[in-house]
Amino acid sequence: DVLFARTMHGVFKNIEFMCTRKDSKTWGKDAWKKIVVCVVSDGRAKINPRTRAVLAGLGVYQDGIAKQQVNGKDVTAHIYEYTTQVGISLKKDIVTLTPKQQPVQLLFCLKEKNQKKINSHRWFFQAFGRVLDPNICVLLDAGTKPGKDSIYHLWKAFDLEPHCAGACGEIKAMLGPGGKNLVNPLVAT
């Protein structure tokens, strides 16, 4: 839940930033209407119960309604959709849901079986991509926290160069206050 919340908090901050771009032809106060946050979870039995609780708190998941079969046929995935006005804050690895002004459109795909990351990417592009027909897509793993305007800058790279097929951002280690995370060998390397 902490990794998921860290990522979603960063995504929400980026949407808020795009909504403050008053002089933009593309963005501005209704920018949130042009952005859909898609979350794909790999396996109903595998999803962390606390992450499920965060999704339920955001309004995009309902516990107990997913079924393995419908009319005798196996279910592949469960799709939930909601426009939330609930925010996420994270302090000392404690996730808190907070009221927020900026709406965020959410699509949540809970795959019935764990079929690994590439299958999740396929779901994202083949299922949601065909329906949403986005100008750009940004893929983030849970735990990756985008800076408050980094998604905007990725979008800007595509906007300035329409023939650009891909771009990536810079990844920085989260050092923590006073660099305390550097004591952790996983962060320090």
UniProtKB/Swiss-Prot annotation:
Keyword annotations from UniProtKB, A to Z: Cell membrane, Cell wall biogenesis/degradation, Glycosyltransferase, Membrane, Transferase, Transmembrane
Molecular function as annotated in GO: chitin synthase activity
InterPro entries referenced in this protein's UniProt entry, alphabetically: Chitin_synth, Chitin_synth_fun
GO cellular component: cell septum; plasma membrane
UniProt-annotated location(s): Cell membrane
Membrane topology: Multi-pass membrane protein
GO BP field: cell wall organization; chitin biosynthetic process
Principal subcellular localisation of the protein: membrane
One Pfam family linked to the record: Chitin_synth_1
Top-rank EC class of the record's enzyme: transferase
Family under the similarity heading: Belongs to the chitin synthase family. Class I subfamily.
Biological function: Polymerizes chitin, a structural polymer of the cell wall and septum, by transferring the sugar moiety of UDP-GlcNAc to the non-reducing end of the growing chitin polymer.
Protein name in UniProt: Chitin synthase 1
Protein species of origin: Botryotinia fuckeliana
